[in-house]
Amino acid sequence: MHNELNNHTITYSEDISNNISSKNNEKFTPKEIQILDKNKKFFSTDIKYVLTMLKIINGESDISIRVLDWFVANYSKKNNTYYNIKKNGKCDRFYVHNEYKNQLNGYSKQYFDPFCRKKKVAYKYTDKISKNVIQFESSIGQLNFFQWAIRNKIIRYVELHLKIIEEDMKETTKKNKEKKQNSQSQEISNSIEMEVSDDPDPNICLSSSINSICLSPVKKTSSASKSDSDKKNKRQQLSKSVYDHGIKKYDYPIQLDFD
């Protein structure tokens, strides 16, 4: 199979359609074919990779997609999470959030997402030993994310630290919810105060039990009290009109001639 990309010919040793096809018969772009081909080669090496992903996306694992997404996007950022992994016989530090951001910058959310969104694909996996066929639906972004997460021990790390990651997600979500509710309550309180009038109720004023009424003084506003944002938002005049300084009145004698 051949595809033209950046004026170079890319050759695929095996037609990707043997394992992956578009759910809605959409055509794959050259970039999508590259991503799918890479993921196909990875998942085809061991059935346990496919089963690990399927347990999570089907809700059969203790790890949920939401927790996995929280770990790479939030928890790892807040805690600067890293660990050592061996690549090419060499141990390197793997900084989770930095690597996650690198993947996002390289692929965008469309092609790197733990959730099954955007273009859907039907994937067929045949076990080389048992010859069992596994078929499931995913997306290009989801396949690419799980390939990265499994290859770089992300899922293994989350398994070992699942409880603390879940607690962090719940606590942070709770605080953000309370903060939002407090902000909304403050806005309502401010709007109520603005609606209160200083004018006396006429029905109350008719009561003989009232000896005196004190009204709060009317607040005076001036142009000097305008906020900086008001001044900044004022549109600048590009040219001046001759009437900017008012209309001047002049007295001139008028002479009318009649033929």
From Swiss-Prot:
Keyword Nucleus: no
A Pfam family hit: DUF7197
Comp. bias regions, Basic and acidic residues: 172-181
Region (Disordered): 172-197, 217-240
Coiled coil: 158-187
InterPro entries (alphabetical): DUF7197
Biased composition (Low complexity): 182-193, 217-226
Swiss-Prot/TrEMBL keywords: Coiled coil
The name this protein goes by in its record: Uncharacterized protein L507
Species for this entry: Acanthamoeba polyphaga mimivirus
